[in-house]
């Protein structure tokens, strides 16, 4: 099986409080994004990587890809103000049919096994996401008051990559752009268009590095992986 992947890496990561794009923050001696790109570079099923960057960081992203020998990163395109705009820019850089994955640049711990399970499911269903059951009790809150406690057994935390038929997800993004609809993730656009989205159970290790605390966890995970 084959797939392409779009990696949005244009966000500034304000919650990381690093003062610059968190993709360039070092994790175990190399940028977070380099770890993420390496997963797809090493996967034989992946044929093409599109990186979506801030316009002023395109050259720096290219240098990063060259430095870490990411030969599949054939295109680096400028993103938009919102993540959704950036993803659509990446999708428009792909011309061939088939499956496309959309994966956060700041999720460096996704595994090839998880990717392959996702791709195999999406090949049958046209849309699939990685997700994990929530561990905590989730309450719906308004102001400082609890409105209701959500049934935890029904709740899953959705991750990336998310996998789609390329033509369908392009159609969903185009319709969303035309109607100024902003989804919470790419799968929500497919749902909005009327398609069902399959769920593939992922791993709690595949978390998004968003805060300084996440970076501490990531360093610990990387150190443990290197000891094995």
UniProtKB/Swiss-Prot annotation:
InterPro entries: IspD (IPR001228), IspD/TarI (IPR034683), IspD/TarI_cytidylyltransf_bact (IPR050088), ISPD_synthase_CS (IPR018294), Nucleotide-diphossugar_trans (IPR029044)
SUPFAM superfamilies, per database record: Nucleotide-diphospho-sugar transferases
Site location (Positions MEP for the nucleophilic attack): 152, 208
Annotated pathway: Isoprenoid biosynthesis; isopentenyl diphosphate biosynthesis via DXP pathway; isopentenyl diphosphate from 1-deoxy-D-xylulose 5-phosphate: step 2/6
Enzyme Commission number, as recorded: 2.7.7.60
Catalyzed reaction equations: 2-C-methyl-D-erythritol 4-phosphate + CTP + H(+) = 4-CDP-2-C-methyl-D-erythritol + diphosphate
One Pfam entry name: IspD
Coiled coil location: none
GO molecular function annotation: 2-C-methyl-D-erythritol 4-phosphate cytidylyltransferase activity
Keyword rRNA processing: no
Residues the UniProt record annotates as site (Transition state stabilizer): 15, 22
Keywords: Isoprene biosynthesis, Nucleotidyltransferase, Transferase
Gene3D superfamilies from the UniProt entry: Spore Coat Polysaccharide Biosynthesis Protein SpsA, Chain A (3.90.550.10)
Alphabetical GO biological process terms: isopentenyl diphosphate biosynthetic process, methylerythritol 4-phosphate pathway
HAMAP family per record: IspD
Record function comment: Catalyzes the formation of 4-diphosphocytidyl-2-C-methyl-D-erythritol from CTP and 2-C-methyl-D-erythritol 4-phosphate (MEP).
Family: Belongs to the IspD/TarI cytidylyltransferase family. IspD subfamily.
Protein's name according to its UniProt entry: 2-C-methyl-D-erythritol 4-phosphate cytidylyltransferase
Protein species of origin: Halalkalibacterium halodurans (strain ATCC BAA-125 / DSM 18197 / FERM 7344 / JCM 9153 / C-125) (Bacillus halodurans)
UniProt gene name: ispD
